[in-house]
Amino acid sequence: MQFASFISLDWGVVFQIVNTIVMYLILKKLLFKPVTKFMNDRQESIANSIKEAEETKKEAYALKAEYEAKINASKEEGQEIIKEASRKAEMRADEIIKNAQNEANRLMEKAHIEIEREKQKVVNELKDEISNIAILAASKVIEADIDKNKHEKLISDFIKEVGEATWQN
């Protein structure tokens, strides 16, 4: 009997064990499964958010690289446009300078021609004037009774002297 008292069960402990098992099963059914489901859903949601953020980050880097490439291309195109405009302006300036030099040369040539023409006109007027003076002098000499040969020689010598003197100047 002693053995029976040693094996005797304390029904209070058995009820506590049964209650703990029942409580565990109820909590597992009502609390652990929803909490576990909630935790798994939350973990999946966070993983999806991280994945979307990484994809968005990759897209942002791709767009950034694309925009930087476009900006660099625009800068290069702008520099090319500026170089081309500068080259055209330089060519236009050279053309204007060349035209101005040609016009100046043309005006100088025209002025030289006009000066030569005026010089020739003055020389011709002087020759006419000298001829008139020579004729006047000749008529005065004739009045002084010089023979005809001497008179002609005197006039031609006078014209030669005056003509050579004016041509040499």
Curated annotation (Swiss-Prot):
Source superkingdom: Bacteria
Keyword Membrane attached: yes
Record bears the keyword Transmembrane helix: yes
Subcellular location(s) of the protein: Cell membrane
Any one Pfam family match given in the protein's UniProt record, by short name: ATP-synt_B
Keywords attached to this entry: ATP synthesis, Cell membrane, CF(0), Hydrogen ion transport, Ion transport, Membrane, Sodium, Sodium transport, Transmembrane, Transmembrane helix, Transport
GO terms under cellular component: plasma membrane; proton-transporting ATP synthase complex
GO BP terms in the entry: sodium ion transport
Membrane topology: Single-pass membrane protein
Family matches, as InterPro entries: ATP_synth_B-like_membr_sf, ATP_synth_b/b'su_bac/chlpt, ATP_synth_F0_bsu_bac, ATP_synthase_B_chain
GO MF, one example: proton-transporting ATPase activity, rotational mechanism
Segments crossing the lipid bilayer: 5-27
Family: Belongs to the ATPase B chain family.
PANTHER family (alphabetical): ATP SYNTHASE SUBUNIT B (PTHR33445:SF1), ATP SYNTHASE SUBUNIT B', CHLOROPLASTIC (PTHR33445)
Assembly: F-type ATPases have 2 components, F(1) - the catalytic core - and F(0) - the membrane proton channel. F(1) has five subunits: alpha(3), beta(3), gamma(1), delta(1), epsilon(1). F(0) has three main subunits: a(1), b(2) and c(10-14). The alpha and beta chains form an alternating ring which encloses part of the gamma chain. F(1) is attached to F(0) by a central stalk formed by the gamma and epsilon chains, while a peripheral stalk is formed by the delta and b chains.
Function: F(1)F(0) ATP synthase produces ATP from ADP in the presence of a proton or sodium gradient. F-type ATPases consist of two structural domains, F(1) containing the extramembraneous catalytic core and F(0) containing the membrane proton channel, linked together by a central stalk and a peripheral stalk. During catalysis, ATP synthesis in the catalytic domain of F(1) is coupled via a rotary mechanism of the central stalk subunits to proton translocation.
Record's miscellaneous remark: The ATPase of C.paradoxum is of special interest because it uses sodium ions instead of protons as the physiological coupling ion.
UniProt-recorded name of the protein: ATP synthase subunit b, sodium ion specific
Species of the source: Clostridium paradoxum
Source taxonomy: Bacteria, Bacillati, Bacillota, Clostridia, Peptostreptococcales
